[in-house]
Swiss-Prot record:
This is Alanine racemase. It comes from Staphylococcus epidermidis (strain ATCC 35984 / DSM 28319 / BCRC 17069 / CCUG 31568 / BM 3577 / RP62A). One of its GO terms (cellular component) is cytosol. The active site is at K39 (proton acceptor), Y265 (proton acceptor). The lineage of its organism: Bacteria, Bacillati, Bacillota, Bacilli, Bacillales. It comes from the Bacteria.
Amino acid sequence: MSEKFYRATYLNVNLDAILANYQNFNQLHANKTVISVIKANGYGLGSVKIAQHLMRHGATFFAVATLDEAIELRMHGVDAKLLVLGVVPTEDIEKAIQHRVALTVPSKAWLKETIKQIPDDNQKNLWLHVKLDTGMGRIGMKDIDEYKEVVDLINKRDHLVFEGVFTHFASADEPGSSMNEQYTLFKEMVNQVEKPIYIHCQNSAGSLLMDGQFCNAIRLGISLYGYYPSEYVKDNVKVHLRPSAQLVSETVQVKTLKVGETVSYGRTFIADEEMTIAILPIGYADGYLRSMQGAFVNVNGSQCEVIGRICMDQMIVKVPSHVKTGEKVILMDNHVDSPQSAEAVANKQGTINYEVLCNLSRRLPRIYYYDNNEEVTNELLK
């Protein structure tokens, strides 16, 4: 291990599982470029390590949400193509050019202001992907005339490159989806002007559920990490994904709770019998939220209930009497059918697996497993 950590709580990340998922989609869409979406710190798992591992195995294109995320990757030696999916402030355009980062064009107004910000003596290219709003209702242009004007403006300027056009599906992971309607509209709009190098509209759900031959690239997000976008998608595809993250802690104290005694804030749990409890050094500041009270965790093979309110840094679990200090506890597992799967955690929290992963705090050390290696990253000690 290259770094250390000083708390018995950590996140296991299997980079080989992520690579297997990437290769799976590479085969599924063999005639397309796979754009690996590693925004939000690689959905909480670590964008730098993920990018570095995928690049070692042939990945050439990544997408992030912000220019800051792109620059972070460049600072860590990621020299692959990078696309920022969000809107970059026009006053920061020179930074994008400096770091060779492709940007999203959300509107004609943004593009005109961007052109003003580019120095007259600039000799470096700025790659642009035009965003079309076909039904998501977020950034992007809905008007075909605006799209034509934007492409024309790009083509008239030296060092501006019309590299891509894309849209985003609003409900590709749901039954009775409007995905096909959006796809049809996207094709109609794109066909009105010359086609750029990259045409992409499929997210993870779209990549699993539709062929999308009009496009020559896909954006692989949640499924890159081994998770299905929804139960509907999981039930309607035959593609096997490998979940890559496991949240682990350890019992740091074991004690007996007598009848009538309480635990944690608000005294919401009152013992109705004598029982053994264990304290874990993990809390909602790590991403294991208060709504997980009443959930079950795996304490060395035993399913044990979370009792009392989860604190910022600690939580309490009811355990069998044989449990001792120092025993391993799995709070989120890397198996689809586990009672502690990311989906099970999401259901308990009343949310989706995306949010569960993204909530994983930076203070959690990440232990990366790849090519028979084990490497620790501790953001707090950098």
